[in-house]
Structure formats: C-alpha cells, structure tokens
C-alpha cells in the first residue's frame, strides 16, 4: 500500500515514478539472455524528429520547436519476436501486475496493448545512439531497465512542459536550446537494472541522451 501511495503521489506531482528493484536481481541474467536470443530481429533506425513527430512548418521561425529536428537513433525488438512462453510476456500479461499498474495510475483498469508489434517491445540504444526530445502520443508508458549503459543514456524529462490547453512552445524552446530556464526544469533519472518506471509522457518532454561511444548497449 505504501508503494502504491508513493507512486500515485509522484505521478500526480510530475508524471513519473520509479519502483526500485521491481524485478529481482537473480532474474535479470535470464531476461538479458532472452534479449540476446531475439536480438537478430532488432529493427534499427536513424532519423531526425521534432518533439511532436510532425513535419516542419515553414511559416514559423527556424528555431521554433516545430522546426527543431534532432537525431533519433536506436532500435526496437517488436512483440512478434517473443516466444509465447517468454518471461517478458509472463510479466506483461500477469493480472497482478496489471492490477498493480492500475492502482499506481489510479485508473479502474489497465489492459495489455493488443498491437502485435508495439504491444511489448525491447528498446535498444547502442554506443553513440540517443532518443531526442519528444512528447509521447500515448497516455503513459511502463518501462523496465534490463541492461544499463556505463556512460550516458540517462532518462531526462521536463515535467508538464505543455498541457492539454496550451503547447507552451516558448517553454519547450528553452529546453531544446538548453537555456538556463529550460535546463532548470529538467529532471534526470538514474535507473538501475530491474527498476520499473511508470511515466506520463504526453505532456512532459523527455529524451535519452547519447550512450557513451565506448559503453555497452543500453
């Protein structure tokens, strides 16, 4: 009950909570091994995106957030790569886990995403790769770190950078330009393998800066 109450409070404040050591340390090597087994089905990409996953607008200034495109690199392993008996699938579909998430999010129910590709994914960042600043199109995301990088790759977010009523382009421009006001709004999470993160990213800009060029894959 204390864990759920703390998660609810943190989500209400800035849309992010972390449950430390959610996955047992003794389970992590097996999960990491499973990722290695299905890694040949990794889909990698290298594109430039703005925070809104939209096209630019020539009627706006060149440094407007809509016209600010930054490299997004990395890859993902889609759900159809997993074996039906996968340990990841077992956790993902566990009714107790779904009930726990709904309690933390303070919603009546949470259901598994039915998309055969995006329902359950492994996100992979190799040396020198990054996820650029962006807003999510979904209401929330649930992520668990399996393998961390030795350098870089820490999750950064700017809580409530926009709202359902206003885009706050000026505020996002501060973040993108790394100006003092923007930097002051950014929080950094140092996640460790086994940590579970619940994040409401629709209105909170976030990114994963570059993984160190000599680091292992995150």
Where are these regions (language model features)?
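Short, well-ordered beta-strand elements within core beta-sheets of diverse protein domains
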Residues: 17-21
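Short beta-strand His + acidic residue motifs that chelate non-heme Fe in jelly-roll/DSBH
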Residues: 131, 205-212
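Short, solvent-exposed loop/turn segments at secondary-structure junctions
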Residues: 23-25, 147-149, 162, 203-205
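Catalytic core of non-heme Fe(II) oxygenases with the double-stranded beta-helix
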Residues: 81-89, 98-196
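Non-heme Fe(II)/2-oxoglutarate
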Residues: 156, 160, 210-218
């Amino acid at each position: 009950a204390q864990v759920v109450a703390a998660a609810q409070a943190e989500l209400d404040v800035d849309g992010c909570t972390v449950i430390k050591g959610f996955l047992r340390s003794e389970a992590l090597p097996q999960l990491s091994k499973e990722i290695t087994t299905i890694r040949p089905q990794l889909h990698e990409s290298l594109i430039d995106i703005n925070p809104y996953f939209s096209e630019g607008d020539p009627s706006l200034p060149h440094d407007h957030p809509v016209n600010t495109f930054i490299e997004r690199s990395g890859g993902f392993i889609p759900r159809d790569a997993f074996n039906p008996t996968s340990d990841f699938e077992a956790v993902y579909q566990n009714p107790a886990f779904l009930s726990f998430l709904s309690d933390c999010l303070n919603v009546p129910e949470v259901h598994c995403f039915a998309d055969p590709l995006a329902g359950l994914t492994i996100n992979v960042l190799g040396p020198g790769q990054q996820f650029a600043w962006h807003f999510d199109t979904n209401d929330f995301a649930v992520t668990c770190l399996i393998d961390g990088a030795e350098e870089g790759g820490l999750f950064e977010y700017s809580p409530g950078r926009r709202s359902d009523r206003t885009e706050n382009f000026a505020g996002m421009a501060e973040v993108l330009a790394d100006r003092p006001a923007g930097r002051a709004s950014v929080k950094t999470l140092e996640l460790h393998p086994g940590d579970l993160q619940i994040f409401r990213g629709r209105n909170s800009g976030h990114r994963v800066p570059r993984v160190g060029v000599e680091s292992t894959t995150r």
